[in-house]
Design a protein with these regions (language model features):
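Pyridoxal 5′-phosphate
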Residues: 1-367
Length: 367
């Protein structure tokens, strides 16, 4: 971002002067890098947005509003972030479609897939599911869900906002028709996201946002739009953010996503071992680092998560507390919130031990 503002500072795809052309080349190279990062065959199918929330809404308004009608069904899970929950709830209310849910096992937060064929039927037009819970770190068998969607002719959307920074993405293996994620969860800047889609579904989307750079010709009688990806990228984009996302991807690829995932598994396994030694620590999610990313969600006895978080903060430990934009999952667990520690490539085993040492102070304060 700094390099853009100090060395370029020009808009893209509009100017014939050198700075604009350099900015355009840099911007388009990031599109190529994103396609490589997710295993996509065509970079023209990578659409830049302002984040995962905008990406999901783009599909909801650009595809859902066009195709959903009374009698149709949309299937999501109970573990979704609100950004992949509320848009489909609102779209079903608007179109008359019915919203159905893949249920959750309240004992460990995993999806119950025994009756998947009865949930995803021929009435279903779209299935939207997360690749990794932002509350528990649980990574559901997405490919199994998208395969069932494909069997009945439904379109699938995979929310990879949490997943993209923790594990290797291969859109072919995931079986997704749409894939969405954000830059700020993967060492990149805020305000930039990605929407990827297969040829058929992207070309079938109506633009949901209109303005400059997406058009071929504007007349008083009507407008002609460009081909992908420009057709779905109206206006001046977050150029600096996109370049920052590209730098983040280069950095992660230099480390290797498999190495990142293995490191997180070691950290999570250690946290689960430490938690098992504590009678007053309740962990939410599978107690298995092999099916989770670097998310450790817990409560300490009857202490409110906000109180736990405040004391941990005084000890120099940053955690998030509350319902984590996932109230339906909290309702499944029968709680109002958790304390969530997020582990990443820069954390160490010592950081985990510091967390559990700091919990001793929480116990003393609320003894």
């Amino acid at each position: 971002e700094v390099a853009y503002y100090t060395q370029l500072g020009a808009n893209i795809h509009r100017g014939v002067y050198e700075l604009s052309e350099k900015a355009s080349v840099a911007y388009d190279r990031v599109r190529e890098g994103v396609a490589r990062f997710i295993g996509a065959p065509r970079d023209s199918h990578v659409i830049f947005t302002h984040g995962t929330t905008e990406s999901v809404n783009a599909v909801a308004y650009g595809w859902g509003l066009k195709h959903l009608k009374p009698g149709d069904e949309v299937v999501i899970s109970e573990i979704e972030h609100h950004a992949n929950f509320v848009p489909w709830q609102m779209m079903c209310e608007r179109t008359g479609a019915t919203l159905r849910f893949i249920p959750t096992d309240p004992s460990d937060g995993t999806l119950v897939l025994d009756n998947l064929q009865q949930i995803i039927t021929e009435k279903v037009r779209l299935v939207a599911v997360t690749a990794m819970s932002n509350v528990t770190g649980y990574m559901p068998p997405v490919a199994r869900i998208t395969a069932r969607a494909r069997e009945v002719g439904a379109v699938s959307l995979v929310d990879a906002a949490q997943f993209a920074s923790h594990s290797r993405i291969d859109v072919t293996k995931l079986g997704a028709d749409f894939l969405v994620f954000s830059g700020h969860k993967m060492c990149g800047p805020s305000g930039v996201g990605v929407l990827w889609g297969r040829t058929a579904v992207l070309e079938d989307m109506d633009p949901f946002f209109f303005g400059g750079d997406m058009i071929v010709k504007v007349r008083k009688s009507g407008t002609t739009f460009k081909d992908l990806p420009e057709r779905l990228e109206a206006g001046t984009p977050n150029i600096a953010g996109v370049l920052g996302l590209g730098a983040a991807i280069d950095y992660l690829e230099s480390i290797g996503m498999d190495a990142v995932h293995r490191h997180e598994q070691r950290l999570l396994a250690h946290a689960l071992e430490r938690a098992a030694e504590c009678d007053d620590v309740t962990v939410y999610g599978p107690q298995d680092a092999d099916v989770c990313g670097g998310v450790f969600s817990f409560n300490l006895g009857e202490v409110h998560p906000h109180d736990t978080g405040a004391i941990l903060d005084s000890e120099g430990i940053a955690v998030r507390t509350g319902f984590h934009c996932a109230q339906p999952l909290m309702q499944v667990f029968g709680i109002t919130g958790t304390t969530r520690a997020s582990f990443y490539l820069y954390n160490t085993i010592d950081d985990i031990d510091r967390l559990f040492s700091a919990l001793e102070r929480v116990r003393k304060v609320f003894a």
